[in-house]
Amino acid sequence: MGALDGKVAIITGAGSGIGRASALRFAAEGAKLVIGDKTAAVHDTAKLVKDAGGEVIALEIDAGIEADVASLVAAAKENFGGLDVAFANAGIIGDMGGIFDFDPAAWAETLRVNLIGPALMVKHAGKAMVDQGRGGAIVLTASVAGLNSGAGPGAYSASKAGVINLAKVAAQQLSTSGVRVNAVCPGLTETGMTKPTFDYAKAKEVTHKLGQLNPLRRAAQPEELANVALFLASDQASYINGQAIAVDGGLTSSHPVTRQLLGQTSH
C-alpha cells in the first residue's frame, strides 16, 4: 500500500525539477494527480506519470493567477472527486538586483509568483479540504534563502521568508479542520531554476565546488526534495504542522564559514 493510496494531489511547477520528481513520487505512492506548470513541459511530466501507470490531469497554468489556481482545484474535484494534498511548488528566481538597484516591478513579479501563488493555493485548496471535512495536507516550497541571508537574491529571499510565515499563519487559521500546512526549504538543488549555476560550474570545471558550504559537501537532487514533500503530504506526518523543514545538507545548522575559521575543512 502506497503512502498516498486513495488520495488526490495537486502539484504546481510540475514541468521539471522538484515538481516533476514529486509528481512521479506521489503517483508511485498511489496518488491521483492534477499537475500544473507555466510551460508545455507539464505534458511531458504527465506522460511519464501515465507511462508508469499513474492517473494524471495536466494543465498549463500561471501559479500566481487566482483563476488558474482555482482551475486546478476544480479539476481535482471534477475528475477525481475531491482533494487531499496540495503542493504549491512553482517559483521563479526573480529580480537579481541589490538593495540599491532593484526594480520594483520585478520584485512585484517575484512576490506574485513565489508568495501570492502559494497563498492562493492555501485559499482554494484549503477551502476545498475544509468543505470536504476529512482534513488534508498543504505543502509549500520555500527555501533556505527564506531562513538565512546569503542564500539567494533579495526579492527571492523575501518571498521565501513570506512563504515560511504563510505556512505558520495558515496552520493556525486552519486549526480544528484537520488540514496541515508545512513548508519545505530546499538548499542548492539541481533543477531548471538553478541550471545556469550548474551550467556555469560545468563550463568552468568546478562542479565539485557546488554545495561545499554544507556539511554533506554537495547539492541536492530533486528526488531528495520529493521524498520530503511526500512525507509531509502523507499521514506519516500527521502531527507535523506549521513547520519549515530545511532540506539543505546541513547548511543552516551553523554559520557556513565556521569550519574554515576553525581550520576544520575535512576529516
Where are each of the predicted segments found?
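Conserved glycine-rich cofactor-binding loop
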Residues: 8, 15-16
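Substrate-binding pocket helix/loop in short-chain dehydrogenase/reductase
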Residues: 97-99, 103-108, 210
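C-terminal helical subdomain
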Residues: 183, 202-236, 240, 247-249
